[in-house]
């Protein structure tokens, strides 16, 4: 279910949300409730009916602070399971020290990491076209696939995400550029 798009998030109560989810359970294996940003009424509605929370954050200080606050609220509300997805990771910035690494974010938030998604223009293109990125042969498509499999209970090592990123390509590009520069006598 998508997050409410109206300003009035109070039109549905937490009890109504619980009833709605109970009505949907016989029809679906998974019911995903998209939560609005922030911790207002819409957030409280979503967690009232949830059996599991997946916190999605980016490796930016303000986003991590918000995620930490959300995790604290989920803990206080006795959420049975809290997982983490780190989105919009830019390895070039991580290498320069301008962005926190996956390990840094995961260590700070101390919840189960189920996936990472690199910052990828294919996601924007796919979204603008109204086409799903999951299931495509792009890196981000694979990352979404791995996350979905983990949500479904498949025990995939997070190394699969790293392998899908093909981090070694960074070194190859660099080597090619060095070779190109050397061959041009620069």
Go through each PLM region and give its residues.
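Conserved catalytic-core segment of NTP-binding enzymes
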Residues: 15, 19, 23-26, 30-125
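C-terminal lobe/tail of nucleotide-utilizing enzymes
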Residues: 76, 80-186
């Amino acid at each position: 279910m998508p997050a409410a798009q109206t300003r009035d998030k109070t039109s549905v109560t937490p009890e109504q949300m619980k009833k709605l989810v109970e009505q949907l359970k016989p029809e679906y294996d998974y019911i995903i409730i998209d939560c609005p940003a922030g911790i207002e009424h819409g957030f409280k509605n979503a967690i009232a009916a949830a059996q599991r929370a997946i916190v999605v954050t980016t490796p930016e200080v303000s986003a991590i602070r918000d995620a930490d606050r959300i995790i604290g609220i989920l803990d206080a509300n006795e959420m049975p399971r809290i997982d983490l997805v780190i989105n919009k990771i830019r390895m070039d910035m991580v290498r320069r020290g301008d962005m926190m690494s996956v390990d840094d974010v995961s260590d700070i938030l101390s919840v189960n990491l189920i996936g990472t998604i690199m910052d990828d223009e294919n996601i924007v293109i796919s979204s603008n076209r109204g086409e799903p990125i999951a299931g495509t042969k792009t890196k981000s498509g694979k990352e979404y696939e791995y996350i979905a499999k983990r949500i479904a209970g498949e025990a995939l090592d997070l190394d699969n995400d790293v392998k899908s990123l093909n981090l070694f390509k960074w070194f190859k590009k660099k080597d090619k550029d060095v070779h190109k520069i050397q061959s041009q006598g620069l």
